[in-house]
Design a protein with these regions (language model features):
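Histidine-centered catalytic/metal-binding microenvironments
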Residues: 253-272
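Feature for intrinsically disordered/low-complexity regulatory segments and propeptides
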Residues: 65-248, 267-288, 298-319, 415-419, ...
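Long C-terminal appendages of very large multidomain proteins
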Residues: 297-455
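Long, low-complexity intrinsically disordered regions enriched in small/polar
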Residues: 1-60, 64
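Intrinsically disordered, low-complexity segments used for protein-protein interactions
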Residues: 25-27, 32, 36-43, 74, ...
């Protein structure tokens, strides 16, 4: 080529031609052919410490290559899969370490389905409960034929995983702070009061940045009073970087909301979600359970036992989803609860996520799991809106005040009344948590009150 421009980095990479199957390059004057895949080109550039490539007379930065119409193929999930496998291995996950050791000689393993299918299963198994299930969905969408619908659902689901990952950490912090307040009083700052009160009272569903702001305030609160963190690895989070990543994810999702998204938006949000999950890799250290029932069992001359019936949320070692299990322990745990516990600890040592996370099926006395995260209060009557994570639909829970209408014996005998009573208990827990957490809050006057819209 007559017109060669010196690129930034230690090496010059010039794209000579692009075919359906390959990219022909000139690397420092030496011809080279690689697979036609954006991830493969990125890997080569990373290996050579090159920040740019040249095609004809134009220089493209790393961020521009994916956006330019160069005929380079772009495959969903490639970046996500490779980066998360490396992060999980660094976090100590033995199966990820073994996998990477086995494929070490295969430099482009992330472009071969016989390797990536195994890696994707390991990733979904590693991440806690509902996050692993949602990652499986993202990977399934990535395999679908390219369409406008695929692009939209991919962006939506990447955004949902980011939101739910931050929410899960916030719920663990709120629950732990609620427990801490049983024995000691803590004073909230003005900003903490404002953000936490908004969490309990807002009639509008929060976006990702709002959840990150709550996380920032809760971490500051725990640090100021030296309260033990519920997830010990939380001190490793770089909150400034998490804020920056979340801001990018929010902007990319906003493009979808305005119907301004393109194919490139999918790859950009996949990259940012990957960075967010690497920040929150601690979520691979925990498990989620939905406790369905506890049965007391004691025989003559034998110690008492508690038979725990629960659903292990997420993907198990055989890659089944939401597996029902039974365990026998010498102590009870809270029933009708979704709990979080460290993988290397007994589930009797847990964080009770209720009423912020509920299993709707448990409340309805139905089999299986239907996990819902608290979303907002209803705009008209202040009832509780919960988001069903499978499809982001809203389950509204009203307060029926059943104990004022019936005695407990009558409630237990009637299935419908008992179900409504169980939902009442969620309301009661939610209000108890709000009242205690905000008991010593700063009373500001700038909250937007939407209570009287329908009065």
């Amino acid at each position: 080529m007559d017109n060669i421009i010196n690129n930034q980095g230690n090496n010059n990479i010039i794209i000579q031609s692009v075919t359906d199957s390959s990219i022909t390059l000139e690397v420092n004057g030496v011809p080279q052919e690689i697979q036609n895949e954006l991830a493969t080109l990125h890997a080569l550039m990373d290996q050579l410490n090159a920040q740019q490539v040249q095609m004809a007379d134009t220089i493209y930065d790393l961020s521009q290559i994916g956006q330019a119409d160069l005929g380079i193929k772009k495959t969903f999930n490639v970046f996500l899969t490779k980066q998360l496998m490396m992060a999980l291995a660094d976090n100590g996950l033995a199966p990820a370490q073994k996998f990477l050791a086995k494929v070490q000689a295969k430099k482009d393993w992330e472009n071969h389905s016989r390797f990536t299918d195994v890696a994707k299963n390991l990733i979904t198994f590693a991440f806690v409960g509902v996050i692993g299930i949602q990652l499986r969905k993202i990977m399934a969408i990535g395999k679908e034929p390219l369409s406008e619908r695929k692009q939209q659902t991919y962006i939506k689901n990447c955004y949902a995983v980011a939101v739910n990952a931050v929410q899960l950490i916030n719920f663990s912090l709120l629950s732990t702070f609620w427990d801490a307040l049983q024995n000691k009083e803590y004073i909230l700052t003005e900003e903490e009061s404002k953000v936490i009160a908004a969490f309990f009272e807002d009639r509008i569903q929060w976006d990702l940045l709002s959840h990150v702001e709550l996380l920032q305030q809760l971490l500051a609160l725990f640090q100021r009073y030296t309260i033990d963190l519920p997830l010990k690895e939380l001190h490793q989070i770089d909150i400034k970087r998490l804020n920056k990543i979340s801001g990018r994810i929010q902007k990319l999702n906003d493009l979808l909301e305005r119907s301004q998204n393109t194919l490139i938006t999918c790859f950009e949000i996949e990259g940012q979600l990957t960075q967010l999950l690497k920040q929150l890799i601690l979520l691979a250290n925990y498990k989620m359970l939905s406790v369905k029932n506890i049965a007391y069992n004691e025989h003559r001359a034998t110690p008492p036992k508690y038979i725990h019936s629960y659903i292990e949320l997420g993907i198990d070692q055989k890659f089944n989803e939401n597996t029902e299990r039974i365990n026998i322990l010498g102590m009870p745990v809270v029933t009708d609860a979704v709990i979080l516990h460290h993988k290397h600890q007994n589930h009797a040592q847990n964080i009770n996520l209720s009423p912020f996370v509920i299993d709707y099926n448990t409340q309805m006395l139905e089999k299986g799991a239907k996990i819902c995260f608290f979303s907002s209060k209803h705009i008209s009557d202040g009832s509780l809106n919960y988001c069903f994570l499978e499809d982001n639909s809203i389950e509204n829970i009203v307060f029926s005040d059943m104990l004022q209408k019936y005695n407990i014996e009558d409630l237990m005998k009637d299935r419908d009344r008992y179900i409504r009573f169980k939902f009442d208990l969620i309301h009661i827990q939610f209000e108890e948590a709000k009242q205690l957490i905000l008991k010593n809050s700063f009373q500001g006057e700038d909250n937007i009150d939407l209570d009287d819209l329908f009065s």
